[in-house]
Structure formats: structure tokens, C-alpha cells
């Protein structure tokens, strides 16, 4: 494995470990970022099920003209995910940035989710 992959894997493992310690039964908002799209889901780790999810690949996102690889798409995904989670009765989550730095698209998604009703 390359040094960058090892560093990213260690960062992801470190973030997940700290989340497990501080979760307190709250669901986890997990973010995955690829070069073309961004995905987010609210997961209940105790039951092992996904409560709500959203991605930039959904029809309503693509029809709005978002490419998926920019900050505007991340904001739209965060807003959509928060609306779905609040509708499912979830208001508090733990933010799992998945080893990604809290910057750019990840930060935009988190800020949009906060503005739309999720607290973390």
C-alpha cells in the first residue's frame, strides 16, 4: 500500500474509534466522497441499519444540474439528507467524516445538514 493510502486508512480508523467512544447511542452521519460524487447516510450502528441516505447520483440532484463533484452538490446532498433524517425522527447525530479532512465538500455537506435541522 502506498504511504498516502496507509495515512488515510489510519486517519479513518482513528476517527471511527473516537466516534464509538463519544456516540452515546446517537446515529452516525457517514460521508463518502469520490472524485465525481458525494454520498451521505445516517446509520444506526446498534441495529445495523441505514435510517436515511442521499447522494449526488439521485435523479432529483442530477435534474437540478448539479455535477456532484462541487460544493453546491454537497450542500444539496446535506440538505436533502437532513430533511429525510428529521422526517424519520432523527435530530441528533454523530458526524463521521470518514478520514476526510473537514474542508471543502465535506464541510459544505455538514453545514447544510446543520442548517436543515440536524445537530452535531
From Swiss-Prot:
Gene3D superfamilies: 3.30.420.100
InterPro entries: Ribosomal_uL18_bac-type, Ribosomal_uL18_bac/euk
GO biological process, any: translation
Origin: domain of life: Bacteria
UniProt keyword Ribonucleoprotein present: yes
Disulfide linkage: none
rRNA-binding as UniProt keyword: yes
UniProt keyword list: Ribonucleoprotein, Ribosomal protein, RNA-binding, rRNA-binding
One term under GO cellular component: cytosolic large ribosomal subunit
Any one GO MF annotation of this record: structural constituent of ribosome
Job description of the protein: This is one of the proteins that bind and probably mediate the attachment of the 5S RNA into the large ribosomal subunit, where it forms part of the central protuberance.
Sequence similarity: Belongs to the universal ribosomal protein uL18 family.
Subunit structure, as described in the record: Part of the 50S ribosomal subunit; part of the 5S rRNA/L5/L18/L25 subcomplex. Contacts the 5S and 23S rRNAs.
Name the UniProt record assigns to this protein: Large ribosomal subunit protein uL18
Organism of origin: Bradyrhizobium sp. (strain ORS 278)
Amino acid at each position: 500500500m502506498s504511504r498516502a493510502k496507509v495515512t488515510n486508512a489510519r486517519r479513518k480508523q482513528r476517527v471511527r474509534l473516537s466516534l464509538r467512544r463519544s456516540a452515546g447511542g446517537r446515529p452516525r452521519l457517514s460521508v463518502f466522497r469520490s472524485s465525481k460524487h458525494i454520498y451521505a447516510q445516517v446509520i444506526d450502528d446498534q441495529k445495523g441499519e441505514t435510517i436515511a441516505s442521499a447522494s449526488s447520483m439521485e435523479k432529483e440532484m442530477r435534474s437540478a444540474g448539479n455535477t456532484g463533484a462541487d460544493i453546491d452538490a454537497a450542500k444539496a446532498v446535506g440538505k436533502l439528507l437532513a430533511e429525510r433524517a428529521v422526517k424519520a425522527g432523527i435530530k441528533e447525530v454523530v458526524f463521521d467524516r470518514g478520514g476526510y479532512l473537514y474542508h471543502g465538500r465535506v464541510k459544505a455537506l455538514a453545514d447544510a445538514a446543520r442548517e436543515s435541522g440536524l445537530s452535531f
